[in-house]
Amino acid sequence: GEALNGEVYNKLLQNTGLAMHEGYGQSESTVIVGNFGDMEVKPGSMGKPAPCYDVDIVDVNGNSCPAGETGELVIRVDKEHPYGLFAGYYKDVSLTAEAFDSGVYHTGDTVYMDDDGYIWFVGRKDDIIKSAGYRISPFEVESVLQQHPAVMECAVTGVEDKKRGQAVKATIVLS
């Protein structure tokens, strides 16, 4: 699945009157973060951590990030391995060791938490476009493009560029 863009959420709400309760999980887990029960939904956010997971957002050095700072979403497993999180990759010890490092499971997804404890998806660690020294998240560019009334859908990718390393390419379906 893909992260739910705030603009898509608002269009659904406007057209149907229904609030969508987004959740985030991986093939390796159950729902890690979500808009559960009667909690207020913040359009575009993934929600708050599920109580069964010890979720943290860490920088490249493994330090917890303050609210508003982007880092990698991890699950701490040093005290207890939560039910619903896989034990490892089948017959792939090295990939398992990479995913479970120093008592944490690395999701590979970058996020930030706001002051209210809601988590917002930024992108994949391996999905970043590097152009002229800048690190660009395709999801962030897609979110901005999606706000334009003439854009129905879009996808952003990096393409080879001799001067910049990569250039940002947007494929757009017009309304």
Positions of predicted regions on the chain:
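Gly/Ser/Thr-rich phosphate-binding loop
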Residues: 1-42, 54, 61-64
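Active-site phosphate/pyrophosphate- and oxyanion-stabilizing loops and adjacent acidic/basic residues
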Residues: 10, 44, 94, 143
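Glycine-centered tight turns that cap/initiate beta-strands
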Residues: 17, 52, 150-153
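AMP-binding/adenylate-forming catalytic core of the ANL superfamily
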Residues: 25, 77, 81, 95, ...
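Short Gly/Pro-enriched turn/cap motifs at secondary-structure boundaries
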Residues: 44-49, 99-103
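Conserved ATP/PPi-binding loop(s) of AMP-dependent carboxylate-activating enzymes
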Residues: 49-52, 63-98, 136
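Hydrophobic alpha-helical segments, especially N-terminal targeting/anchoring helices
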Residues: 58-59, 67, 107, 113, ...
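Residue-level recognition of short loop/turn positions
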Residues: 59-61, 70, 115-116, 150
